[in-house]
Amino acid sequence: MPYTAEAFQNEFLALGATEVNAIVTVTSSGAEGGRRTSGATEIIIVDASGSMQAEGRINAARQAAKAAVECIDDGVNFAIIAGVSTAQQLFPAPGQLAVSSPQSRSDAIRSIDRLQASGGTAMGAWLLLAAQLFGQRPGDIAHAILLTDGDNGERAGYLEQVLDSIAGRFTCDCRGVGVNWKVSELRKIAQAMLGTVDIVAQPSGLTAAFEQMMVKAMGKTAADVQLKVWTPVNATVRFVKQVEPEVMDLTGKRIEDGPRAGRYPLGSWGAESRDYHICVDVPAGAAGDEMLAARVSVVEGDTVHAQSLVRAVWTEDTALSTKINRQVAHYTGQAELAEAIQAGIEARKAGDDRTATIKFGRAAQLAHASGNKATEELLATVVDIEDAATGTVRLRRKVEAADEMALDTRSTKTVRVGRAQ
């Protein structure tokens, strides 16, 4: 599976400077012929709690789950979990995985017709059962879809314990239907499991959302790709963040690999490209000094697919050292944009209109300057943007809950910058 890794940076540092920043673009053309390099397992987790009866949500969830099953390729292992106060395996028999075929997909669809809404919400238990099922197929491309419409009902801290114990075993894309679920809860799951989170405001949108997630999952051809970052003596990694297609901090997911290297999980890959912001602290150098600040490799197990170097060169020439690389500047702004939106939402909920206005104003300014039109349009559902260039906004008196939740869930989505300096 061919990969490339390309670093974008201004390697010139002012005298006394110790912080090195680079954007590393990792691109994969996918496996030859689109064939997977390992097996694949898919698990669909559908909230079947009592609240799913409202607004036709359970019926829409049934149709969405059926549509997702129809998208599963022949030969892929799969299972369906009904989520209530416990995790109940709907298909196949408890503790087993089915192998996708026209017959097994037809059987699964009949099982989905039995899905009824009653009981509570226990996301930790649902995820734990999924992890146990995935455990039967080590090395597979492992992906889950989790749908809910409400708050987790488990004791405080239990979901976090489960996430700590299963992180890295599979990726999980989370969707909330309606407006009675917590964005922070699903974001916690998605971040721990290297997945995505989004709102499906109306039940009628579930089928398209499920089909989109499953089709994307079927395009993955490699199971466990990692970014290995080596730094020299006296240099340390400050952070590693995915910054495109959305912001995700990978710093805390580091696994040590030898005395001066660490691996950061990137999840499963197909034919795609993603950008990562690497920040390294190095000892200050004298004018003319040059050093390798980091060696960044794309790896699978012991196989190194691609490599890129991050350099540092100290100079007295301020024209060189003060020039901020376009990619670094752009993605630093996109990360600030996500933080500003989330801070604005929190301030608005707390009744702090002044802080909310300031944060949303800064977000509007950043979205406009970076060409992130999708985020600018989402902001316009929460504030009236009077002048995006200066960040002048007014809070709207009435904001639909679905609009605010859409802004929150999609705040981390970024746009790519052109490659010219």
Language model regions located:
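Short acidic, flexible loop segments centered on an aromatic residue
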Residues: 82, 227-235, 245
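Local beta-strand/beta-hairpin segments that build beta-sheet-rich folds
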Residues: 90, 96-98, 275, 289-295, ...
